[in-house]
């Protein structure tokens, strides 16, 4: 860790272990992923046992909470879109004497579209499956566009396939920028 010119602590990883506590309300189950803005963990509400996802923002990527505020407001605006993971609340923790913003949202069971495709014969979908997947994606993106928003970074690692059968139930990750 090094400090940049604005004296914001530069954290590259939180490395939270399973069983760790977040704000006394949540217990860390495990790390789901990481990216430019921060890390995402699967967590469990202590009082209800409900599993959620928590995005912890790196402080140097979230100056004055601008990034997390924008992200939360965008998710709130898109809350009625079926393809969006539902945002619940913002929390604050202190990590190494630094305030860290956390956005808590629904935890969605499923797998990344990239992993789903790798498991398919020839790593591709049949034309019938592909049409259904593209239709589900187009309908979800249309809902977002009708609200004058966009994804900004749509690719197979930002799409979760949470149900597959006659149709696909898809959810989008990383709705920022």
Label for each model-derived stretch:
Residues 1-21:
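Juxta-kinase regulatory segment immediately upstream of eukaryotic protein kinase catalytic domains
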Residues 86-101:
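Short beta-strand micro-motifs within the conserved protein kinase catalytic domain, predominantly
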Residues 46-67:
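ATP-binding glycine-rich loop module of kinase domains
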Residues 133-134:
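Activation segment signature within eukaryotic-like protein kinase domains
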Residues 97-112:
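Conserved short submotifs of the Hanks-type protein kinase catalytic core
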């Amino acid at each position: 860790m090094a400090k940049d010119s604005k004296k914001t602590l530069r954290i590259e990883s939180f490395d939270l272990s399973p069983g760790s506590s977040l704000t006394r309300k949540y217990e860390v189950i495990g790390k789901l992923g990481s990216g430019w803005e921060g890390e995402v963990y699967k967590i469990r509400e202590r009082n209800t046992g409900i599993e959620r996802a928590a995005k912890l923002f790196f402080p140097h990527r979230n100056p004055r909470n601008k990034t997390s505020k924008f992200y939360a407001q965008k998710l709130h605006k898109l809350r009625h879109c079926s393809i969006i993971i539902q945002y619940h609340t913002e929390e604050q923790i202190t990590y190494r004497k630094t305030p860290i913003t956390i956005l808590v949202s629904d935890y969605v069971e499923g797998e990344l579209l990239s992993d789903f495709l790798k498991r398919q014969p020839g790593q591709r979908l049949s034309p019938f499956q592909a049409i259904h997947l593209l239709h589900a994606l187009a309908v979800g993106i249309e809902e977002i566009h009708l609200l004058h928003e966009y994804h900004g970074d749509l690719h197979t690692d930002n799409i979760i396939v949470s149900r597959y059968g006659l149709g696909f139930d898809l959810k989008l990750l990383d709705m920022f920028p």
